């Protein structure tokens, strides 16, 4: 029998009162006896600290603090230590007789928080002779010792041979070592486990029934069914993994589309760029060659343009020089025309002014006559006015006389007024302000004499005027004519000059008559001269264009030669046009054929790709469409055979799965109904009783029981009878055996064992012979062996089924691929390759383009020659009619001679035209110039002055006469106011006076009117004279200007000048037009040269850039090709059908794929970075790197155990097949993995029954425990009503709740929680998740309710509570509960610890004075029966009969406090024996 481990001693080093004290512990009870403050609690605290060194748990409170929520600040530990290093060590010996010292080093930490530093350690291999105090202390002298620090202790122990020292950094490691060595009963894995252990120690230390333990008895007493829970967790993990795998498969199936999309878009992205670069490389090569051809052509064109530019520049310089002369000639001709036109206008003005002068002279003579008549009428009017005045005066005098007679005063008054008025008028007219009535007579005589003198003088001058007027007018006329012709001269020279002018006029008229014939002759000669000059210019131009000088005699022969050349070139051009049309037609046909082939090529290439893929997939070569259809028939036959074989393997695999499921049922029952019946009958399946039968004995027992191997063993058959009535849900044959399931044996049968068989004597007349089965299924070992073989067979069948399924799906997909090929590509797949024909046609097209180019060059040269010949013929056609003019050398001299004669004639005509009229007028009156009447103007002025003097004298004399006649009236001033009435005679006189005054007024008005009219006539006459003089002056100016112009203004002069100007203008225009043409041509030539130069530079730059680009691209392309070939992706990227797309289409295709790829790789950082780097257009190899990265990314996701290929495209095809197979397999696996709800209920019920039986056994050990009135203690275990209902529903009504357990969204734990909530809606689940609740429901401990009951006196069994028991009874009851807990822990941990170790059992009891002697004796008995150590702290009056007792007395010596300890072992039958130890005080 295995000995139980024991605690040998407890050592305290440097504790309060204990410097170095070792307490040897008794094998049963160790009692610490002493008064208050003796150190009992300190000793126990040191033991607990060494046992559980967790400062978060340690709390040493006094008994009075029991139940308090808070204690002292240091939790009772800091105050129990002394300053410096402290130790608490436990010396133990385990079941293997190994000595192990475990302990802790404690040290107070300075500070107000009163903290303690704890370091656990362990010592192994220590010799039995070495005491713990010797390890940690060093003796200085007889009365002094020193405590060793932990590092010195470590060094000291390492120096000892065979001794192991371990220091722990975690409490978990410390407790793990103590559990493995059998020091503690339970493995303390976590802080929760340490807390339970501490609560147990604390409960035992302070005694009583601990509410912390009784409230959680399930956690302390019921072991965690980790196996069942792990099975559930494994099952759920498998289901979860299976569902996650299914979900992953679904995700993978969706990712498969993503992968296909990724591969497709990556291929499009990279292949489009790859083919675009390939096309661009070819295009760049073609462009480089084209640039080189254009470069050479442009150089030739530039040289030709430079030669052409030199010729045109030379011709332009000649035209520029000629243009200056022509402009000067044209300007001179224009000026001459302007002068002629001006002279003609001047001549017209002169003629118009001469006509105006003649008209004005006539009008002037007429106006003179009118003025003379008006003067005569004016004199008559004046006489009539004077008569009217006399009559009025007479009537007035008569009226005055008569008035005087009637009224003297009135008459005098009137006369006076009239006299005053006359006097005033006389003063005014005579300019005599001092004139008076008295002096008027004297002045009258003076003015009458003056009037008479003036009249005589006027008459004398009038007579002289009439005589000189006629002679004066003729002389002036003749003199003015001479002045007009010859210019200003003296009047005495007029006669001689006039005669000379008349002779010159006769000569000029004779010359003027020759102007017209000379002008006509000159015009004719000038026209011929111009034609001769034009012919010379044309000939010079022609020679210059031909580049050779020709004589006049050679021109006709040259004309014939050029016409012959034109005819031959015209035929050549016509033939060249036809030849070009034939070449163009052939080129168009080739282009059309190439276009058709290029449209067919991608379709043919796609068909070839599909055909090659089919050939690779099936490993066959197809040469015609018939081969494809024949292979398709073979494929269909192969598919049918594979499907049949797959179905057979699947059926066998399902059978094996069913057998495995049947054998895997809990309890070894193959029929689930037997488990329900066994539970219903209160029995046990026979297979459960023989569950642990060995594999060797399984055939025997299987044959022994035969058909009854599935029987139910019940305690009493009579109690089952009532259950059999109406039983229908059971197997056809139900066997029941009466017996005790706990002690069942096979003695119920009489059996004889044979060779590999048995004979069972069922009754006297009935035997059964049963052979040993080849595959026994009785017992767990046999079932597991059979299940293992079935699993192996199932693996083979699954692999074969997977292979067949894969082959079937592969065949089906191949069939679909063939069907798609036949529908899409069969019509064109076996046609000839169009690309060789395209290459051949392209080479022919290049030849045609070259031929067309050469033909165009030849045709261009012929066209130039043709145009040059046509221009030469046109020029000769203009020159040949003028050959006679070219030969006439005297034409220019004749023109000059006629021009001189014409100038003389035109000068004479101009003189006759200018002065002909004046000479004609001068000729009849030239004789009057011999005498000059110079005094006529002076006479005329004197006459006018005498007339004015005569009129003034007459008016003055009249005014003075009137004053003299009224001189007597001045004395009537006093009668002015004395008026009276008039008579009839007075009225008549007055009327007659009025008539006379009216007549006088009319005469005056008439006089004034005639005077105004005379004034008008005089004004008209003056204006006519002024106009005549002005026009005469203007005429003289015009004649002088015409002479200054110096141009003959005849009728044909303007026409000749205009013709000359127009001819020069035409020549100038032609010259300018040609110059402009040359300038434009030169500008165009320069522009063309500039363009050619720029084009040449650009071509050179483009050629060298393109050449460099081709060279660079070649290196880059080589790198790309090397990378493509190294990674084996050329077949994927070199898609020949893309070669027929344009660069824009390929770029668009690549850009679209890039946009799709950005979305596809957005979640993959590596691919996203590689894709971003690949977007650099200058680094095409990065796109290949991206493509390789995509392939590598997909290869990494290929499961090589499933898909045996490195090609992601093929892998995706295989993946589709494999995923569908895996989906089917995992779905069936999930159905098999999912444990039934009935099985769960059975497992939980069986576990509950097992634990109830274990608790029942534990209760048997407590039946005889008694404390005071408590006669017995037991644990009552019941199933909770809500959980029992859950188990019933799971086992019997699970069909109603399959919506929970069949849901793919819920795990079994979650479904169980949902069912619990459905059954108990009144229970509040709080914030816990269904998964947490379900995991709790899978733990059988949550189904049980546990409580402690005591049998106390007459009350019988009642719930153990502190309030219902005395203190001693509570302590005893609590101790009993703790013993049960420790025993339960040992049972639970037995399978975790080595089988050769039985752990130490030790509990505490402080303040044991509350127990009576009977209770203490019961504790001793309990410790002895359970091999448990107990440490009791009791006052001095307690003296146990057994065990070891320590008496502690705390003393003070020289201000030093220490505890005096005396140990006693047994005192009743034996003498007291002092235990080892000393009372030394600390130094």
Curated annotation (Swiss-Prot):
Question: Which key words are in the record?
Answer: ATP-binding, Cell cycle, Cell division, Chromosome partition, Coiled coil, Cytoplasm, DNA condensation, DNA-binding, Nucleotide-binding
| Entry-linked Gene3D superfamilies | 1.20.58.850, 3.40.1140.10, Immunoglobulin FC, subunit C (1.20.5.420), MukB, hinge domain (3.30.70.3500)
Q: How does it assemble?
A: Homodimerization via its hinge domain. Binds to DNA via its C-terminal region. Interacts, and probably forms a ternary complex, with MukE and MukF via its C-terminal region. The complex formation is stimulated by calcium or magnesium. Interacts with tubulin-related protein FtsZ.
Coiled-coil region: 326-418, 444-480, 509-601, 780-804, 837-923, 977-1115, 1209-1265
GO molecular function terms attached to this record: ATP binding; DNA binding
- Family the UniProt entry places it in: Belongs to the SMC family. MukB subfamily.
What's the name of the protein? Chromosome partition protein MukB
Pfam families named among the record's database cross-references: MukB, MukB_hinge, SbcC_Walker_B
Role played: Plays a central role in chromosome condensation, segregation and cell cycle progression. Functions as a homodimer, which is essential for chromosome partition. Involved in negative DNA supercoiling in vivo, and by this means organize and compact chromosomes. May achieve or facilitate chromosome segregation by condensation DNA from both sides of a centrally located replisome during cell division.
Places the protein is found: Cytoplasm, Nucleoid
* This protein's domain notes: The hinge domain, which separates the large intramolecular coiled coil regions, allows the homodimerization, forming a V-shaped homodimer.
Write down the species.
Answer: Shigella dysenteriae serotype 1 (strain Sd197)
Q: Return the annotated region ranges for Flexible hinge.
A: 666-783
Q: Which InterPro entries match?
A: MukB, MukB/SMC, MukB_hinge, MukB_hinge_sf, MukB_N_dom, P-loop_NTPase
Q: What does the entry list as the binding residues for ATP?
A: 34-41
What's the encoding gene here? Answer: mukB
One GO location term (cellular component) = nucleoid
- What GO biological process terms are annotated to this protein in UniProt? cell division; chromosome condensation; chromosome segregation; DNA replication
Question: Per its UniProt record, what NCBIfam families does this chain match?
Answer: PRK04863.1
Q: Does the keyword Iron apply?
A: no
Q: Which HAMAP family match?
A: MukB
């Amino acid at each position: 029998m295995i000995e139980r481990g024991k605690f040998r001693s407890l050592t305290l080093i440097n504790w309060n009162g204990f410097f170095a004290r070792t307490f040897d512990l008794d094998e049963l009870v160790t009692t610490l006896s002493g008064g208050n403050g003796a150190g009992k609690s300190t000793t126990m605290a040191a033991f607990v600290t060494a046992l559980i060194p967790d400062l978060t748990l340690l709390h040493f409170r006094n008994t009075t603090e029991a139940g308090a929520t808070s204690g002292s600040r240091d939790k009772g530990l800091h105050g129990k230590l002394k300053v410096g290093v402290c130790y608490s060590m436990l010396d133990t010996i385990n079941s293997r007789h190994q000595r192990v010292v475990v302990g802790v080093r404690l040290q107070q930490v300075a500070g107000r928080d009163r903290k303690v530093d704890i370091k656990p350690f362990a010592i192994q291999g220590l010799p039995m002779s070495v005491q713990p105090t010797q390890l940690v202390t060093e003796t200085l002298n007889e009365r002094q010792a020193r405590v060793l620090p932990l590092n010195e202790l470590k060094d000291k122990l390492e120096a000892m041979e065979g001794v192991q020292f371990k220091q722990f950094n975690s409490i978990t490691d410390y407790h793990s070592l103590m559990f493995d060595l059998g020091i503690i009963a339970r493995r303390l894995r976590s802080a929760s486990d340490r807390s339970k252990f501490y609560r147990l120690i604390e409960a035992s230390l302070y005694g009583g029934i601990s509410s912390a333990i009784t409230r959680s008895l399930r956690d302390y007493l019921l072991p965690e069914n980790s196996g069942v829970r792990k099975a559930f967790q494994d099952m759920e993990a498998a289901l979860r993994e299976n569902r996650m795998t299914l979900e992953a498969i679904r995700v993978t199936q969706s990712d498969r589309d993503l992968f296909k999309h990724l591969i497709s878009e990556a291929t499009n992205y990279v292949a489009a760029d790859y083919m675009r670069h390939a096309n661009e490389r070819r295009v760049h090569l073609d462009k480089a060659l084209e640039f080189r051809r254009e470069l050479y052509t442009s150089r030739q064109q530039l040289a030709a343009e430079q030669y052409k530019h030199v010729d045109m520049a030379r011709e332009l310089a000649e035209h520029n020089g000629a243009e200056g002369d022509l402009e000067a000639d044209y300007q001179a001709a224009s000026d001459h025309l302007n002068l002629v036109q001006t002279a003609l206008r001047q001549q017209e003005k002169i003629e118009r002014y001469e006509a105006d002068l003649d008209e004005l002279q006539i009008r002037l003579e007429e106006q003179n006559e009118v003025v003379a008549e008006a003067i005569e009428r004016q004199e008559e009017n004046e006489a009539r006015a004077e008569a009217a005045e006399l009559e009025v005066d007479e009537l007035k005098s008569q009226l005055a006389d008569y008035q005087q007679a009637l009224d003297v005063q009135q008459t005098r008054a009137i006369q006076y007024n009239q006299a005053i008025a006359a006097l005033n008028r006389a003063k005014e007219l005579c300019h005599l302000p001092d004139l008076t009535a008295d002096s008027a007579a004297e002045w009258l005589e003076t003015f009458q004499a003056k009037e008479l003198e003036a009249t005589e003088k006027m008459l004398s001058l009038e007579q002289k005027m009439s005589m000189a007027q006629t002679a004066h007018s003729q002389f002036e006329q003749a003199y003015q004519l001479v002045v007009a012709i010859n210019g200003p001269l003296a009047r005495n020279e007029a006669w001689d000059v006039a005669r000379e002018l008349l002779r010159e006029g006769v000569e000029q008229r004779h010359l003027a008559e020759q102007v017209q014939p000379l002008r006509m002759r000159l015009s004719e000669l000038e026209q011929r001269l111009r034609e001769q000059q034009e012919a010379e210019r044309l000939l010079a131009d022609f020679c210059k264009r031909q580049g050779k000088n020709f004589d006049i005699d050679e021109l006709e022969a040259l004309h014939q030669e050029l016409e012959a050349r034109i005819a031959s070139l015209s035929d050549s051009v016509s033939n060249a046009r036809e030849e070009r049309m034939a070449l163009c037609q052939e080129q168009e046909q080739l282009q059309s054929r190439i276009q058709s082939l290029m449209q067919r090529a991608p379709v043919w290439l796609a068909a070839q790709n599909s055909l090659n893929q089919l050939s690779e997939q099936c490993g066959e070569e197809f040469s015609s469409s018939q081969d494809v259809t024949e292979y398709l028939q073979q494929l269909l036959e192969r598919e049918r055979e594979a499907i049949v074989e797959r179905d057979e393997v699947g059926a066998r695999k399902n059978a094996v799965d069913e057998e495995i499921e049947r054998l895997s049922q809990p309890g070894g029952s193959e029929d689930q109904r037997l488990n329900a019946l066994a539970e219903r009958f209160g029995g046990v399946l026979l297979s459960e009783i023989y569950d642990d039968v060995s594999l060797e004995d399984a055939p025997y027992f299987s044959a022994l029981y035969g058909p009854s191997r599935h029987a139910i063993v019940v305690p009493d058959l009579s109690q089952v009878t009532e259950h059999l009535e109406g039983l229908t849900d059971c197997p056809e044959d139900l066997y029941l055996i009466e017996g005790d399931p706990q002690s069942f044996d096979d003695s119920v049968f009489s059996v004889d064992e044979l060779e590999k068989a048995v004979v069972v004597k069922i009754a006297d007349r009935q035997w059964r012979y049963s052979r040993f089965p080849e595959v026994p299924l009785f017992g767990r070992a046999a079932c597991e062996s059979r299940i293992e073989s079935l699993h192996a067979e199932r693996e083979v069948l699954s692999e074969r089924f997977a292979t067949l399924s894969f082959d079937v799906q592969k065949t089906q997909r191949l069939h679909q691929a063939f069907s798609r090929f036949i529908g899409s590509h069969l019509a064109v797949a076996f046609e000839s390759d169009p690309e060789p024909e395209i290459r051949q046609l392209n080479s022919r097209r290049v030849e045609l383009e070259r031929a067309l180019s050469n033909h165009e060059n030849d045709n261009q040269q012929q066209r130039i020659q043709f145009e040059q010949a046509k221009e030469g013929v046109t020029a000769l056609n203009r020159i040949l009619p003028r050959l006679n003019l070219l030969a006439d050398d005297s034409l220019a001299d004749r023109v000059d001679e006629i021009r001189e004669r014409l100038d003389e004639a035109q000068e004479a005509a101009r003189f006759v035209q200018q002065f002909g009229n004046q000479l004609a007028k001068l000729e009849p009156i030239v004789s009057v110039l011999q005498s000059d009447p110079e005094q006529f103007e002076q006479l005329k002025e004197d006459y006018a002055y005498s007339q004015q003097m005569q009129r003034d004298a007459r008016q003055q004399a009249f005014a003075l006469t009137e004053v003299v006649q009224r001189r007597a009236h001045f004395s009537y001033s006093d009668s002015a106011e004395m008026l009276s009435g008039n008579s009839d005679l007075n009225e008549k006189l007055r009327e007659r006076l009025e008539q006379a005054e009216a007549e006088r007024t009319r005469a005056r008005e008439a006089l004034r009117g005639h005077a105004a009219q005379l004034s008008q006539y005089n004004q008209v006459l003056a204006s006519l004279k002024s106009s005549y003089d002005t026009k005469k002056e203007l005429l003289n100016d015009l004649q002088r200007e015409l002479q200054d112009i110096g141009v003959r203004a005849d009728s044909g002069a303007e026409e000749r000048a205009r013709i000359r100007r127009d001819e020069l203008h035409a020549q100038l225009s032609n010259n300018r037009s040609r110059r402009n043409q040359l300038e434009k041509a030169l500008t165009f030539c320069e522009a063309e040269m500039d363009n050619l130069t720029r084009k040449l530079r650009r071509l050179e730059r483009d050629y060298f850039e393109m050449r460099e680009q081709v060279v660079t691209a070649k290196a880059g392309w080589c790198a790309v090709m090397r990378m493509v070939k190294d990674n084996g992706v050329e077949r994927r990227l070199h898609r020949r059908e893309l070669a027929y797309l344009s660069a824009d289409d390929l770029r668009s295709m690549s850009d679209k794929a890039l946009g799709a790829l950005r979305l596809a790789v957005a979640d993959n950082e590596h691919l996203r970075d590689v894709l971003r780097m690949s977007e650099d257009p200058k680094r095409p190899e990065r796109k290949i790197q991206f493509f390789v990265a995509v392939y590598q990314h997909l290869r990494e996701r290929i499961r090589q155990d499933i898909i045996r290929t490195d090609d992601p495209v093929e892998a995706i095809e295989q993946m589709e097949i494999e995923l569908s197979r895996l989906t089917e397999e995992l779905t069936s696996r999930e159905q098999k993995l999912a444990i039934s709800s009935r099985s769960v209920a059975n497992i939980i019920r069986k576990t509950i029954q097992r634990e109830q039986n274990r608790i029942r056994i534990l209760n048997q050990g407590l039946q005889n425990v008694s404390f005071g009135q408590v006669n017995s203690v037991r644990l009552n275990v019941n199933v909770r009503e809500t959980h029992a209902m859950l188990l019933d529903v799971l086992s019997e009504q699970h069909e109603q709740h399959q919506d929970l357990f069949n849901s793919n969204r819920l795990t079994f734990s979650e479904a169980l929680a949902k069912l619990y909530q459905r059954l108990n809606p009144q229970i509040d689940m709080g914030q816990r998740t269904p998964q947490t609740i379900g995991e709790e429901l899978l733990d059988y401990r949550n189904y049980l309710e546990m409580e402690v009951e005591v049998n106390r006196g007459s009350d019988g069994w009642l719930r153990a509570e502190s309030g219902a028991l005395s203190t001693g009874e509570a302590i005893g009851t609590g101790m009993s509960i703790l013993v049960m807990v420790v025993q339960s822990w040992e049972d639970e941990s037995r399978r975790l610890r080595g089988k050769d170790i039985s752990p130490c059992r030790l509990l505490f009891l402080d303040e044991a004075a509350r127990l009576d002697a009977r209770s203490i004796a019961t504790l001793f008995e309990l410790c002895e029966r359970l091999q448990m150590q107990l440490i009791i702290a009791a006052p001095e009056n307690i003296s146990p009969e057994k065990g070891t007792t320590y008496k502690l007395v705390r003393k003070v010596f020289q201000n030093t406090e220490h505890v005096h300890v005396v140990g006693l072992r047994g005192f009743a039958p034996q003498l007291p024996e002092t235990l080892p130890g000393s009372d030394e005080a600390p130094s």
